[in-house]
Amino acid sequence: MMQTTVRGEVVEPYAEALLSLAQTHNLIDQFQQDTQLMVELVASSGELQQFLANPLIKPEAKKNVLRQLTVDKVHGYFLNFLMLLVDRRRINFLSSICEHYRALVRKLRNVALAEVTSAVELNDDQRRAVVEKVKTMTGAADVELVTACDPELIGGVVIKVGSQIFDASLRGQLRRLSVTLAQAT
């Protein structure tokens, strides 16, 4: 319940406001890059996460650190947005806001996000085949792939799009076979 409230009252409105700003100034792609940069910065530094979330640190100190980290790396409007988040004491929701912004852009552009796990790294032909499969499954105009490797799959792929999971892995096939055999006895 608490996460739903935070999402509805903080994350969604700020992400929607950022998208509105991006649309007004034709900066959707630029803000895509800026949000990705910020998500990566925050994810890669536990110290930065703690610093931004600490209510005892003065807002001006947080702004200075953000300016130093993003100088010449993000658009000025996006930097102003970061400063607004600090002023409104919402900067600790930065990663969630950025991720929601990226989801809104995908929805706007009819792009599906596919999380693909395979036993080995996919080559270009395999990536194209997965993209086409996801387009067929979802009716999306394009697909954004997030890939990961899991040798325990033995072979094949597991594709997750939203709440749908397409398991074409050897491990999944063996599991289904064992369930079928167990039910038969």
From Swiss-Prot:
Q: What subcellular compartments does it reside in? A: Cellular thylakoid membrane
The record's Gene Ontology cellular component field reads: plasma membrane-derived thylakoid membrane; proton-transporting ATP synthase complex
Q: Which InterPro entries match?
A: ATP_synth_OSCP/delta_N_sf, ATPase_OSCP/dsu
* Membrane topology, from the record: Peripheral membrane protein
Chief place where the protein resides? membrane
Keywords, comma-separated and alphabetical: ATP synthesis, CF(1), Hydrogen ion transport, Ion transport, Membrane, Thylakoid, Transport
Indicate the family of this protein.
Belongs to the ATPase delta chain family.
Assembly and oligomerization = F-type ATPases have 2 components, F(1) - the catalytic core - and F(0) - the membrane proton channel. F(1) has five subunits: alpha(3), beta(3), gamma(1), delta(1), epsilon(1). CF(0) has four main subunits: a(1), b(1), b'(1) and c(10-14). The alpha and beta chains form an alternating ring which encloses part of the gamma chain. F(1) is attached to F(0) by a central stalk formed by the gamma and epsilon chains, while a peripheral stalk is formed by the delta, b and b' chains.
What is the protein name stated in its UniProt record?
A: ATP synthase subunit delta
Write the lineage as a comma-separated list. Answer: Bacteria, Bacillati, Cyanobacteriota, Cyanophyceae, Acaryochloridales
